[in-house]
């Protein structure tokens, strides 16, 4: 049970980290596109 819970927490952290990273990248690319226009 404990191991399964740890695995779930790890997967959730991974998902949140990837999500925030993706948002930062998309925000940065949108800003770059707006500046080049």
From Swiss-Prot:
Cite the entry's keywords alphabetically: Host cytoplasm, Host mitochondrion
Major location category of this protein = host cell
State the protein's name. Answer: Non-structural protein 6
Q: Which domain of life is it from?
A: Viruses
- Subunit-level organization: Interacts with NSP2 and NSP5.
What does UniProt give as GO cellular component?
host cell mitochondrion
Where in the cell does this protein reside? Host cytoplasm; Host mitochondrion
**Among its keywords, does the record have Protein transport?**
no
What the record says about family reads: Belongs to the rotavirus A NSP6 family.
